[in-house]
Amino acid sequence: MKGGLKGALKGGLKTALYILVAIPVTLTAQRTQAPRDITGYWVSVVSEDWHWRMVTPRKGDFTSLPLNDEGRRVANGWDPSKEKPADACKPFGAAAIMRVPGRVHITWADDATLRIDTDAGEQTRRLQFGKLATRGWRVNGRGEIEYFQQGTDAPPPSGPLTWQGYSAARWELAPDPKTVRNAVFFAGGLGTSPDGAGTIVPGTFGSLYVVTTQLRAGYLRANGIPYSEAARVTEDYDFWTDDVGAEWFTVSTTVEDPKYLSAPFVTSTDFRKEPDGSKWRPTTCAAY
């Protein structure tokens, strides 16, 4: 793609060129801006970390977790016999819920709010659009793709801390090679933009980016591995289709916690789309 852009520039563009992607920021545009329809039922496919995800690990097993001294102290002091009913959902908070085996149901609560329900723990996440800085891409004078950010993130609202916290989301729209090529021609006076009005439409390439804060303290794993109220969770959801036509998404999750972690804790989790909700089995935190 890079060479093709350079060729187009050499063919007729004499001056430095910057083409900005117009990413709609109005709340009503968020649903229609989705790179694809991501609604429906999805099941987690556990292909790694089976012995930490499918069963409760033994006390003191914090393999692969970057706990600091305080985190290890709390994890080693975990006593399940002292857990209260109010603690039952600690392993189902936003910092860990996508790693819990089960199904998720994705719907739009409204044009600016994506809703994710889980059958494991009966949790509901609400991803709010229009709260994060706008991110886009442009083609520079060397025919290279550059990413840029405009504006600032809105602060989270005040209120009680919850298991799922406050999640702000945006679409990370990447350039479609064909769209970029058309954009270069348009800027050089050699053609028209994809929509005929100067707006570069990013096509079907892209992912979902989510930042979650305002979390109630919980567990990264069911054996008492802690995360605190200061935890910050960032997620990248990539939606894709395999060679046999099955739809998938992969969520890369990063948990940062200055109280209990010495470094970010990063995981990658796969989900496959199901045809309907016939296998949906809601299970409370206590019964899981």
What are these regions (language model features)?
Residues 1-3, 20, 148-150:
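Short intrinsically disordered, low-complexity coil segments enriched in acidic
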Residues 14-26:
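Bacterial N-terminal signal peptides
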Residues 29-288:
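PEST-like low-complexity, intrinsically disordered acidic/proline/serine-rich tracts
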Residues 3-16:
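Short, low-complexity intrinsically disordered segments enriched in A/P/G/S/L with frequent Arg
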Residues 11, 28-29:
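Intrinsically disordered, low-complexity regions enriched for glutamine and histidine
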